[in-house]
Swiss-Prot record:
Hydrolase as UniProt keyword: no
Species in which this protein is naturally found: Canis lupus familiaris
InterPro entries in the record: Delta_tubulin, Tub_FtsZ_C, Tubulin, Tubulin/FtsZ_GTPase_sf, Tubulin_CS, Tubulin_FtsZ_GTPase
Similarity section: Belongs to the tubulin family.
CDD domains: delta_zeta_tubulin-like (cd02189)
Any Pfam family matching the protein: Tubulin
GO molecular function annotation: GTP binding; structural constituent of cytoskeleton
Gene behind this protein: TUBD1
Protein name stated in the entry: Tubulin delta chain
Location in or out of the cell: Nucleus; Cytoplasm; Cytoplasm, Cytoskeleton, Microtubule organizing center, Centrosome, Centriole; Cell projection, Cilium
Role description: Acts as a positive regulator of hedgehog signaling and regulates ciliary function.
Residues passing through the membrane, by range: none
Coarse class of the protein's main subcellular location: nucleus
Length: 453
C-alpha cells in the first residue's frame, strides 16, 4: 500500500526532500547485509510505499509540494532532479508569489479557502496513481504561517474528503528560545486543529535534534540541512519495510495502519515521538561495535528517563514499584521524571536481529494501567540493515514525553492572550478570541489526560 506525502511550507518541503532522499538511498544501498532476494523484496516494498512508476528509470516521489512562495519549491525540485535517481512529478507542486508572513490566520483563513480546489486536485491526482492507499503523511512546521496555518486547513480537508484514509502529521516543534514572536499562538492553534482532524501527530523537537547534531554527529556549525538529515534518518528508520510477523519473509503492506493500530489506542492520545540508537558520524562508526543487549538497555533507559539521545542519559530513573496507588505513582513519577507510556513500538534492523531480547520493554511498570502490556508493546524486525548501521533500533512511543514542552507552550500563549498581545493580527483574518479559547481548552485537556497516565 502506498503513502501520499504532502509537503507544506519551507520546513515541510526541505524535510520532505531529505526523507525521500534517505528512503531512496537506503533501499538502493548495496550493504544491506542480507541475501540478494531479500534485498530485492525490501526495495520493491519501499518503492511501492513512496515512489511511483519510473520514467526512464527514474523513480517519482508520491508527493505533493505546497508553498506560498516559489523559492523553496524550485530548490527542492532541482535538488531531487540533480540526484539523477529520483525526482518529483512535473505537476505535483502548488506555489504562489506571496507567503503567509508567519501569520497562522492568514495561512488558514485566506490561503486555505482561496487555493483549496487547486491543492486538493493535486492530491487527488496523486491518490489516483496508487493501487491502494495506506494514507497521508503530512510534513509541516508548527509555528510558522504557511506550513502551520495552511497545513491545518489541508489536513482538515483531507479528513473531510478521505475520511476512511489515515492521516499522520509530522510536525516540527519550535526551538524553546523562539524563532517567531507569535510562535506559541501558532503552535496552540496548529495542535488544537490537528487534534481534531489527524489520526496521529509525530513530533520532532528542534532543540532535541540540534543536540543530536552537536553531541552525536559532532557537527560544529549546524545547518537546517544537517537537522533535516537527522529527521529524515529517524523517519526512514520507522517507515522502511519490516516483516509482518516473527519468522515471516513477507513485508508489512500497510505502514500507517500498522503504526496507528500499535500506538494510538484512544483518540485522546495522539502524540508520538521517535528515538534512535545508534546515531553517530561516519568517523565514529568506524571504531564502534554494537550488541543488541547494549543497544536495547540504552534505548529502554532513554524511554523511561525521557532522554532523546544516548548521551547524557539519567540512569537514576527507575520504574515505580508495583502496587503503588495511582495518585502516589503520579507524584512519584514527577519527582523521578519517570516517563509513563501508553504504547511502544520497537523496530529492529540488522544482523542477528532475531536474537535480540526485548523483555525489558514488556515490563508492566512502564505502562499506564488501563492497557494490558501485551497490547501496549509491539516489535517489528528485519535482518536488512538500515543506512550505514549493522544493527540499529528505533523506538516510536506514545508517552508523556511532550508533557512539559506542551504545558510550557500553552502557558506562554495563555499569558500573551490574557494581555491581548498581537490578537489583532489573527482577528483581522477571521480567527476570533473564541477560537483561541477553544484551542486552549482542548490542549489543557490533552495535558491533563497525559498527566494522569
Amino acid at each position: 500500500m502506498s503513502v501520499v506525502t504532502v509537503q507544506l511550507g519551507q520546513c515541510g518541503n526541505q524535510i520532505g526532500f531529505e526523507v525521500f532522499d534517505a528512503l531512496y538511498s537506503d533501499s538502493h544501498c548495496p550493504q544491506g547485509l542480507c541475501s540478494e532476494r531479500e534485498n530485492e523484496a525490501y526495495q520493491a516494498s519501499s518503492k511501492e510505499r513512496f515512489f511511483s512508476e519510473e520514467e526512464n528509470g527514474v523513480s517519482i516521489a508520491r508527493a505533493v509540494l505546497v508553498d506560498m512562495e516559489p523559492k523553496v519549491i524550485n530548490q527542492t525540485l532541482s535538488k531531487a532532479a540533480q540526484s539523477g535517481q529520483w525526482k518529483y512529478a512535473q505537476h505535483s507542486c502548488f506555489c504562489q508569489k506571496e507567503g503567509s508572513g508567519n501569520n497562522w490566520a492568514y495561512g488558514y483563513s485566506v490561503h486555505g479557502p482561496r487555493h483549496e480546489e487547486s491543492i486538493m486536485n493535486l492530491i487527488q491526482k496523486e491518490v489516483e496513481k496508487c493501487d491502494s492507499l495506506s494514507g497521508f503523511f503530512i510534513i509541516m512546521s508548527m509555528a510558522g504561517g504557511t506550513g502551520s496555518g495552511l497545513g491545518a486547513f489541508v489536513t482538515q480537508n483531507l479528513q473531510d474528503q478521505y475520511s476512511n484514509s489515515l492521516k499522520m502529521n509530522q510536525i516540527i516543534w519550535p526551538y524553546g528560545t523562539g524563532e517567531v514572536i507569535v510562535q506559541n499562538y501558532n503552535s496552540v492553534l496548529t495542535l488544537s486543529h490537528l487534534y481534531r482532524s489527524s489520526d496521529a501527530l509525530l513530533v520532532h523537537e528542534n532543540d532535541a535534534i540540534h543536540k543530536i547534531c552537536a553531541k552525536l554527529m559532532n557537527i560544529k556549525q549546524i545547518s537546517f540541512s544537517d537537522i533535516n538529515q537527522v529527521l529524515a534518518h529517524q523517519l526512514g528508520s520507522v517507515f522502511q519495510p519490516t516483516y509482518s510477523v516473527e519468522g515471516s519473509c513477507h513485508y508489512r503492506r500497510n505502514p500507517l495502519g500498522d503504526l496507528m493500530e500499535n500506538l494510538v489506542p484512544h483518540p485522546e492520545f495522539k502524540m508520538l515521538g521517535i528515538r534512535n540508537i545508534p546515531q553517530m558520524s561516519e568517523n565514529s562508526l568506524t571504531y564502534s561495535t554494537f550488541t543488541w543487549a547494549g543497544l536495547l538497555k540504552h534505548l529502554r533507559q532513554m524511554l523511561i528517563s525521557n532522554s532523546k539521545m544516548e548521551e547524557g542519559i539519567n540512569w537514576q530513573v527507575r520504574p515505580p514499584l508495583p502496587g503503588l496507588p495511582t495518585l502516589g505513582k503520579v507524584s512519584l513519577n514527577r519527582e523521578l521524571h519517570f516517563n509513563t507510556s501508553i504504547a511502544n513500538l520497537v523496530i529492529l534492523r540488522g544482523k542477528d536481529v532475531h536474537s535480540a531480547d526485548l523483555g525489558g520493554f514488556k515490563d508492566p511498570a512502564l505502562y499506564t494501567s488501563w492497557l494490558e502490556p501485551i497490547d501496549a508493546f509491539n516489535v517489528w524486525k528485519t535482518q536488512r540493515a538500515f543506512s550505514k548501521y549493522e544493527k540499529s533500533a528505533a523506538l516510536v512511543s506514545n508517552s508523556q514525553f511532550l508533557l512539559k514542552p506542551l504545558d510550557t507552550i500553552v502557558g506562554k500563549a495563555w499569558n500573551m492572550f490574557a494581555s491581548k498581545a498581537y490578537i489583532h493580527q489573527y482577528t483581522k483574518f477571521g480567527i476570533e478570541e473564541e477560537d483561541f479559547l477553544d484551542s486552549f481548552t482542548l490542549l489543557e485537556q490533552v495535558v491533563a489526560s497525559y498527566c494522569n497516565l
